């Protein structure tokens, strides 16, 4: 007995849908690297296609089927893959399986293990970051498909609030003055001690478009994010390490806006070889310690726009 293709029938309400698909789909992926051991990931996929108003539903099983096929093919081939290239292949396969689709999108998130050493005692530990890839394809009326891809990372760090620190410094000046210290002595004292403030766990994200013929190193993105906050966080810290991390962060206080702007500047400097119309997304979220809310800053732009703004500021 042949089953009817219910998905291909007309819906009761004839309205198109922008994105239909599956989320929270996990697969084991092994990526090849030149002259290095393979990277094994357990990414979470989100895959979508659009749906015309004339069709009741997408053929839902085809989307996870596409991921399975692409992942299996990677294991058999000798080519070197990046997560962004994996996403592009999935997008192209989605168009093959969903012939009615004019748009297809893939998002990939995965934990990424990094070897770290504590800053003073040099103890080895494993740190976890998150790598992200996105591919988005559009098919025109002639069947031509244009796909854009992005790659990025999300890293946790520490930030120290400049505002509270400045207020405590002013309070210290008043207190020391009342106790009879001279202005010269107060300046020496404040230069010799670390002024307290409240901290945040910062979460920095950078996504960069990868034009055809270009590469964008995830390790470079991770370094940019780490270097743009008040300091790094570590899984393993002995007492001397902990003192170093806290003091270093308090000597480098930053607002959430400072972190975002620092990432922007570093992206423009490090990836100066990318075309000027390359898309860049920078986001910083700081988990507040003395508030119930979080602080947020973001910029979505092109390399050209960011470079021009930075040039204007330096002239």
Curated annotation (Swiss-Prot):
Subunit and interaction comment: Homodimer.
Gene3D superfamilies given in the database record: Urate Oxidase
Classification lineage: Archaea, Methanobacteriati, Methanobacteriota, Methanomada group, Methanococci
Enzyme class: hydrolase
Domain of life: Archaea
The protein, known as: GTP cyclohydrolase MptA
Annotated catalysed reactions: GTP + H2O = 7,8-dihydroneopterin 2',3'-cyclic phosphate + formate + diphosphate + H(+)
A UniProt-annotated Pfam family: GCHY-1
Residues of the site described as May be catalytically important: 161
Organism field: Methanococcus maripaludis (strain DSM 14266 / JCM 13030 / NBRC 101832 / S2 / LL)
NCBIfam families in alphabetical order: GTP cyclohydrolase MptA (TIGR00294)
GO biological process, one term: tetrahydromethanopterin biosynthetic process
Pathway connected to this protein: Cofactor biosynthesis; 5,6,7,8-tetrahydromethanopterin biosynthesis
